[in-house]
C-alpha cells in the first residue's frame, strides 16, 4: 500500500494542484501603474485601458470612490464597467444627473453614446394638476415649479402653453426607442462606450490587453504566461485532464487493492464497478455552490432608482417581485445578471449556475 499512497500523491499534484493553481492567477495592469485593481464599495475592476492609457482618466479617490474625468463635462462616479462590451455606466456625485445632462459635452474624450435620443426638458407650475404617473425630476424642481423630461415630442407639445420648454438636447440613451411618457430614468445612470482601443477579443479569451510597446498606439493580447490567466479552451483542457487523472488514479488504486487481496478478487471488481457507477450521482448531488463561494459574488445596494446597472430590469427573475430601494442584489460574474441576494443564494446552493442563461464559473 506504500506504492498506492505515492501514486495517489503524484496524480493529485499533477492533475489537480498544478493546473488549477496556474489557471486561477488573476491578470494585472503593468507594474508601473500604482492605482489599485479594484476601487470603491462596488469593487469596480480597473485595468487597461483605464490604466496605462493617457485618454482614459479614471481615478480612485481618497474617499474610495471610482471617478471618471471627462474634459468638457467634469467628474462622474463610475458604477460599472463592462470590458467585454466596452461600456461604462456613470452617475453624478451630487445625485442630479439630469442637471449635468443639460450641459453635457463628451467632446475630447474617447467615449461616445450608444444611442442619441432627443429629449425635451420642461418646467411646469406646481399649481398645474398633473396625473400621478407624471414623474418629475426632484433635484431640478423647487417650491414653485416642477421639472420634467421626455423623449416623446407629442407629449411635450401637449403640455404647452401651461408649461414652458427649457431645452431640447440629445441625451445618451440605452435604447433608440422614444418613451411614451415622462422619463423617470435620467437621474439613474449614463451609459457610454468606447471603440478604441479595441480589446473585446482579449477580454472574451481572458487575456490581458495592452500596448504592443511604449512607442506604438496599437494594442495586442498578451498570452497566459504574461497575463496570468488562461483562455477558456485551455481551462477546459485542464479540467478534462484533471477528471481523467482522477479516474486513472481511482482505477489504479482499485487494481492494487485487488492484487493485494486475492481471496476477495471475486467480489472486489463488481464492488469497484458499482462505485464507479455511483460517481455521476455524487457529482450531480454536489453541483451547487458553497456559501463561501457565493459570498464572493459581487453585491450592490440599490438606490432610489431601484434599477441595477447593465441590462438588468427592475424585477427579480426568480421571485418576480420588483426591487425596492435599499435592497441588496447579487450579480453572477460570467453574465452580470442580478437577482435578490436572498433569492439567488438559495438557487446557487442547489444549481450553481445563472437561472437565466445557465452560465456557471469554470
Swiss-Prot record:
Q: What is its EC number?
A: 2.3.2.27
| Topology with respect to the bilayer | Single-pass membrane protein
**Could you cite one Gene Ontology molecular function of this protein?**
zinc ion binding
Which PROSITE patterns would you find in this protein's record? Answer: ZF_RING_2 (PS50089)
The identity of this protein, by name, is Putative RING-H2 finger protein ATL21B
One GO term describing the cellular component = membrane
Q: Where does this protein come from, organism-wise? A: Arabidopsis thaliana
Catalysed transformations (reactions): S-ubiquitinyl-[E2 ubiquitin-conjugating enzyme]-L-cysteine + [acceptor protein]-L-lysine = [E2 ubiquitin-conjugating enzyme]-L-cysteine + N(6)-ubiquitinyl-[acceptor protein]-L-lysine
Subcellular location field? Membrane
Q: Which family does it belong to?
A: Belongs to the RING-type zinc finger family. ATL subfamily.
- Report the record's Gene Ontology biological process terms: protein ubiquitination
**Keyword annotations:** Membrane, Metal-binding, Signal, Transferase, Transmembrane, Transmembrane helix, Ubl conjugation pathway, Zinc, Zinc-finger
Q: Where are the transmembrane segments?
A: 234-254
Q: Which Pfam families match?
A: GUB_WAK_bind, zf-RING_2
Entry's free-text remark on domains: The RING-type zinc finger domain mediates binding to an E2 ubiquitin-conjugating enzyme.
* Residue intervals of every RING-type zinc finger in the record: 316-358
Query: Where does the signal sequence lie?
Result: 1-23
Q: Which InterPro entries match?
A: ATL20-22-like (IPR046948), WAK_GUB (IPR025287), Znf_RING (IPR001841), Znf_RING/FYVE/PHD (IPR013083)
As recorded in UniProt, coiled-coil segments are none
Q: In which pathway does it act?
A: Protein modification; protein ubiquitination
